């Protein structure tokens, strides 16, 4: 199935600002988070939203996406030009303009590929950090042959077709005349080596797949979509090169009571009419424990109070965020007759007598004649 446009996924246009992208992601990820939304397809929708945000929130990835769309030749780890169909023309123009010196030695040590792992963590784990362990499938250098791919006691031989270069030259007729085109050697598949007696453990691959446990330190203050690098825990290096790195991207679960925006926490405090009108002192929950908050008399619905340093520790060490408490005054749905009478008396004193629902036509006519 064809991928949807990332801007369309987040309900945005290409002119959207970073702040708009972030807000759209937070809204949609909360709406479709698998822990909060059990509808069929919510999980796939959440993954689509996360993928769109991962690209559009990164300036470099966004710039490439805006230019190439989903056909970005540099997308993903280890990506880049140089696949099947364009290799010939690249070599032709490289030779024509004098770029022939860029050929790589297939036997030179090369760094292994990077790996990416998405890790789901709880709201509190993201705020306070945690030491944990993950288990991932990854390739490891074969311990039997030490990565050579050859049976112990033997060595790979130099390919006689390409003399160990891993590439062969081929004459190609072009509009510029006959030119030499380099192609991967089909005998050794570009490795420059021939393994006559393969290692029985890895079957000549030089590596085996294992499930490896890796210790991970979740940094305090990490936010949804951020990632950390675990050096040397990617795929094994080639020809004795260093291993790649493991990038762990965090997906933070939502919370029933709190909402996070950067280093700040938001909490909705429900008050009764008497509490808002007369004032009160209330215990308010925070991620750090309960604190007392004084509600001044006459507080209106929508009023906001700041609890300094009761938010999230900045992941880069730039201080603490705050918690913002937003008031919501609740209107009682069921009243006793005594409560209704007291409210009527209050309304009379205030000079604002409401036309109550449920009054009979006779009562309304009676009040009219009585001048009420």
Swiss-Prot record:
Matching CDD domains: DnaJ (cd06257), DnaJ_C (cd10747), DnaJ_zf (cd10719)
Cofactor note: Binds 2 Zn(2+) ions per monomer.
ZnF CR-type span: 129-211
UniProt-listed Pfam families: DnaJ, DnaJ_C, DnaJ_CXXCXGXG
Cellular compartment(s): Cytoplasm
Entry annotated with the keyword Metal-binding: yes
Membrane-spanning segments: none
Binding site for Zn(2+) 1: 142, 145, 199, 202
Superkingdom of the source species: Bacteria
Residue stretches of each CXXCXGXG motif repeat: 142-149, 159-166, 185-192, 199-206
Main function: Participates actively in the response to hyperosmotic and heat shock by preventing the aggregation of stress-denatured proteins and by disaggregating proteins, also in an autonomous, DnaK-independent fashion. Unfolded proteins bind initially to DnaJ; upon interaction with the DnaJ-bound protein, DnaK hydrolyzes its bound ATP, resulting in the formation of a stable complex. GrpE releases ADP from DnaK; ATP binding to DnaK triggers the release of the substrate protein, thus completing the reaction cycle.
NCBIfam families documented for this protein: DnaJ_bact (TIGR02349), PRK10767.1 (NF008035), PRK14276.1 (NF010869), PRK14280.1 (NF010873)
Domain writeup: The J domain is necessary and sufficient to stimulate DnaK ATPase activity. Zinc center 1 plays an important role in the autonomous, DnaK-independent chaperone activity of DnaJ. Zinc center 2 is essential for interaction with DnaK and for DnaJ activity.
Protein name (record): Chaperone protein DnaJ
Organism per entry: Lysinibacillus sphaericus (strain C3-41)
Gene from which this protein is expressed: dnaJ
